[in-house]
């Protein structure tokens, strides 16, 4: 199976071009004002024009108001929504769009295999479950987590697509993919020179590392 790749937190046209050239399957825009990678709907709409056919655009939110999501839907027309806050299943599903639900593995209640699997099952209509590390704030922490916590999710026959995040970079992504065999990985700070400024070299290195694992697994 080929591991899909999403490069998240894009803020510049040249970084979209780098991700696309390297073979990324999706790019992500962050609509969380507290993030250093935040873009507003108007800017995201400009960036979206640089994304070619067959590369998905993902819109990331943290506890948004419905009107904030609607503004992104109207301006950007994302292919997928991604919720990283305390959104309920009803919050995520109210827009009638495909969505990813993020879980901060290791957070209170999500610090055991059973607890994490139980939380995931509440979002059975999600297009995928994304697993990031726990930190005090919202959004990506840039840190890894114990992948053993995913055992209950991996054993669940009703599991949705597993998207692995949390501190991934060119130097560790191969081991992470080999251990978890996720449907996809989601990377942001691990391919940056500065917050919101991606490195074309790091993106290429990341993609090459993932491809090397996928080729062996065939």
UniProtKB/Swiss-Prot annotation:
Gene Ontology biological process terms from the UniProt entry: L-tryptophan biosynthetic process
EC number annotated for this UniProt entry: 5.3.1.24
Catalytic activity: N-(5-phospho-beta-D-ribosyl)anthranilate = 1-(2-carboxyphenylamino)-1-deoxy-D-ribulose 5-phosphate
InterPro entries assigned: Aldolase_TIM, PRAI_dom, RibuloseP-bd_barrel, TrpF_fam
Swiss-Prot/TrEMBL keywords: Amino-acid biosynthesis, Aromatic amino acid biosynthesis, Isomerase, Tryptophan biosynthesis
GO molecular function, one term: phosphoribosylanthranilate isomerase activity
SUPFAM superfamilies assigned: Ribulose-phoshate binding barrel
Domain of life: Bacteria
Pathway, per record: Amino-acid biosynthesis; L-tryptophan biosynthesis; L-tryptophan from chorismate: step 3/5
Pfam families: PRAI
Keyword match Isomerase: yes
The keyword Coiled coil belongs to this UniProt entry's keyword annotation: no
PANTHER family: N-(5'-PHOSPHORIBOSYL)ANTHRANILATE ISOMERASE
Family: Belongs to the TrpF family.
Protein name: N-(5'-phosphoribosyl)anthranilate isomerase
Native source organism of the sequence: Bordetella parapertussis (strain 12822 / ATCC BAA-587 / NCTC 13253)
